[in-house]
Amino acid sequence: MDSLDAEQLSALQKAFDSFDTDSKGFITPETVGVILRMMGVKISEKNLQEVISETDEDGSGELEFEEFVELAAKFLIEEDEEALKAELREAFRVYDRGGNGYITTDVLKEILRELDNRLTEEDLDSIIEEVDEDGSGTLDFNEFMQMMNG
């Protein structure tokens, strides 16, 4: 549960509670599918059953809140990563002025200066040296992603 923020946990608790109408402390696998689909998760029935059986630690056939959160977290985190990748791809596209599939290290320096104006020229050169492993003077999208993801 560490990987979810308070807002996400609260939303999951509300969804769980609204489907646990008898306050029994668990929801059925069918309900899990409904909740995930309401959250915008696209999952086949087969994949849903596989994920539920992996998560249903006590083998009860139902999911307690903690199990439900563990299951939902997999999808929420995955979606966050996909959204981040899409945003980074768009940022890369904007800076790839020639549409060549790469940005120059000079453009990268501009980006880094915009992100942190306290970076010295030495700092920038050090960063460039680290991320431009092949010394080409350019970064393709994968190199850019590696740098942005730390």
UniProtKB/Swiss-Prot annotation:
Binding locations of Ca(2+) 2: D132, D134, S136, T138, E143
The family this protein is said to belong to: Belongs to the troponin C family.
Protein name: Troponin C, isoform 2B
Function comment: Troponin is the central regulatory protein of striated muscle contraction. Tn consists of three components: Tn-I which is the inhibitor of actomyosin ATPase, Tn-T which contains the binding site for tropomyosin and Tn-C. The binding of calcium to Tn-C abolishes the inhibitory action of Tn on actin filaments.
Annotated binding of Ca(2+) 1, by residue: D56, D58, S60, E62, E67
Family matches, as SMART domains: EFh (SM00054)
The EF-hand domain, residue ranges: 7-42, 43-78, 83-118, 119-150
Species this protein is from: Homarus americanus (American lobster)
